[in-house]
Amino acid sequence: MPTGITIGCNKRFALGVNYAWRNFSADFGGLATWSIQGVSAAPAGYAADLAAMKAAGASVIRWWVFPDFRSDGVQFDANDDPTGLSASALADMAKALELAQTAGVYLVPTIFSFDAFRPKQTTENVTVRSIAPLVKAPARRAKLVANVVTPLAKAAAASPHRARLLGWDLINEPEWAIAVSGQNSQDFTPNEELTAVSLAEMKALITEMMGVLKTETPAAFTSVGWAAAKWSWAFTDLALDVNQPHIYGWVNQYWPYTRKPAELGYPATRPTIMGEFFLQSMPFSDSNANDTFAVIMESWWTNGYAGAWPWHHRENAANLPLIKTFADAKGCQAKP
């Protein structure tokens, strides 16, 4: 393990797992219309989940915050511009860090996701606004950063348990919401259900978020959960602290897990963590590959990756022993 992430004052392989949520897009802020409580209102279930992940050897938890805007966490005005975070969302961030302290784990909150780029819709009496118009317009994007990202970061920084904030994942798989750019033969293929923005607009969002997060929480690393190495060419100029690519069967067919980070297009000047891959005995079986979890993890360990977070606890909790086997074999190099 020639590289790693500093965890608990020592450089370690950042072994973790995607939570990624207990209630999709409602863990932070809750969703009263659907009778869903956030972390601070119903901490027992979240605490039990974190304890189970820790017991399985996971020390880093990737946890989604606002993958879309269905929750009561983000407040909006009549123009659908964000005006701030609810008291419950701020309390939920504080509680999440407290629970992380109790469980002995570190958090990497994922602030946004490509899911939020769906057009505005109303589902079961809940209006879910779209992030796309906010990203497209510089003035509205500034409100998004000032009124959502900034207070979230300030809440984390104000926590007495802020040391449990290991890093940030600014946005999950933004490539699915980027329009064809004409800049590379490996161009974007946006999800047809989403309202795509330009590459420049997406990079502006990421850059503006980075500025706030590094100011408010300077000890926490910044990353983006990249959908695939196919699009690594587009983001090498972003000054993120950690590369965080994702890999599933379709990616592995063309950009195999056996390659070192630099061979996949990720800058060697910063650590690379595999941020998503299936938590199952053969993670790439969706493309008929029979490589085992243990073999894949050992390859990343050997080839200089700084960590790995399989997907995900909510659906694959029965497979947590796969993580524990690896954690036990590596000892303190993989778990504080």
Would you name each region that the model predicts?
Residues 1-6, 332-336:
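Low-complexity, Pro/Thr/Ser/Gly/Ala-rich linker/spacer regions in secreted
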Residues 4-240, 246-249, 281-288, 298, ...:
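Active-site mouth of glycoside hydrolases
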Residues 46, 206, 257-258, 293:
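Amphipathic coiled-coil/heptad-repeat helices and related helical stalk/stem segments
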Residues 108-117, 261-277, 318-327:
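Short secondary-structure transition/capping segments
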Residues 135-142, 326-336:
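Short, basic, helix/turn surface patches
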Residues 258-273, 277-304:
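Surface-exposed substrate-engagement region within the catalytic domains
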Residues 301-334:
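Aromatic/acidic polysaccharide-binding cleft in carbohydrate-active enzymes
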